[in-house]
Amino acid sequence: MAQHSAVAKARKAIDNLTLTVDTYKSAFNTLQPALTNDETRNRADTWALASRIQIEMYDKYMDNKQVGKQVDTKAMGHALIDAYTYSMNALKLDTIRVLDRKGNAQIDKKTGKPKVKTKYSRDVINRLVEHHNDYRIAGSALYNVKDWDGAYTAWEDYCLLASRTDDRRWAVDDTIIAEVRYYQGIAAWQRGDTTAAVKLFQTAREGGYNHKEAYDYALMCLSDLNDVQGVVTLAGEAYARFGTNDPQYIRILINDFINRGEYDSANNLLDEAIATNDKDDELQNLKGLVVESQSNIEDAMPYYLRCIELNDSNAQGQFNVGRYYYNQATQMRDRSRLVGKKLANLVNPVYSQALPYLEKSYAINPNNKDLRNALRDIYYKLGQADKLQAIESVKD
């Protein structure tokens, strides 16, 4: 009976005309033991009251905010989130069997099951309907204070309410749901749930949220998951929608063709992309790699040179140009019958020609082992002991 008394006391506390956030907190603290006590935890009225307290406390927070008072954004948002949970419990428990005059359960002729009625559901539903959009607002507020879990849950509650069929007032346009799912995906990514984020971004796109960021975030998440095929598939969808406005999509597709040895397909796609954007250094470098794979590095050199002309900080482009001269010097050395100083006079100028490109590439990307080995060889052959010692000291 003690917990029944707690429920009654909490109900009386919130029936006062002048209430504050602290009043609602106190009322909920009075009620809280009843949510777990066997006497009261299986009663719909217990949970309906808990829901009402949380929603009205949320409203009081909002009133305070609107008149310029400082409010606890996180506590405000979680009051609404808790109200959803308590409301669902109330609705689940709010079934009263209809009895006949003899006290026996009445049977529904259509279903053959006992007839039931509800006592609290109407009020619970009405409160939620009135606050449906507040869940979307609360999600944004919680996100802004970096409460990723809270934002995720508030947006999930919003979408779950929109999917209910027990009241036509829940209906929300699909495009709004899609946008909310996108933001929920961002929250999932922020809290480290990358798999959930990928699914939510997909749901957003399927619902009509086809903004570029819905593809870009998903690509990033798929990459983090090492889902190579997923990245390629989504890049294809993004390329079909956005074309070469963002070269990252076509680069992914071209690299995939190259990795699978489908050079003709890679070439065709590259030519299409370069025709649209001939000042993209990475496309020029990729074109060179494809041409080299199909033919030789001599035919690829114009593309590598164009790449570093457009962007002298393109490490791969610098490496490829330097690699051309380094390989040329190595071949000359292998094929020549000269020895000693005469051989050095023949090949060292070509090694020297390779050096600035390779050093530039190394300064940008020192993790390229092939590049480091080439520099080590050149420094040795040119007698540059200090540079050789420096690069020898680098650990793999």
What are these regions, as identified by a protein language model?
Residues 13, 54, 142, 181, ...:
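Residue at a conserved register position within TPR or TPR-like alpha-solenoid repeats
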Residues 18, 22, 41, 53-145, ...:
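Short coil/linker segments at helix-helix boundaries
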Residues 29, 33-36, 92, 160, ...:
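Conserved structural position within tetratricopeptide repeats
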Residues 39-41, 95, 163, 209, ...:
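Short coil turns that delineate tetratricopeptide repeat
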Residues 46, 167-169, 180, 213-214, ...:
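TPR alpha-solenoid repeat register
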Residues 49, 176, 183-186, 217, ...:
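Canonical tetratricopeptide repeat
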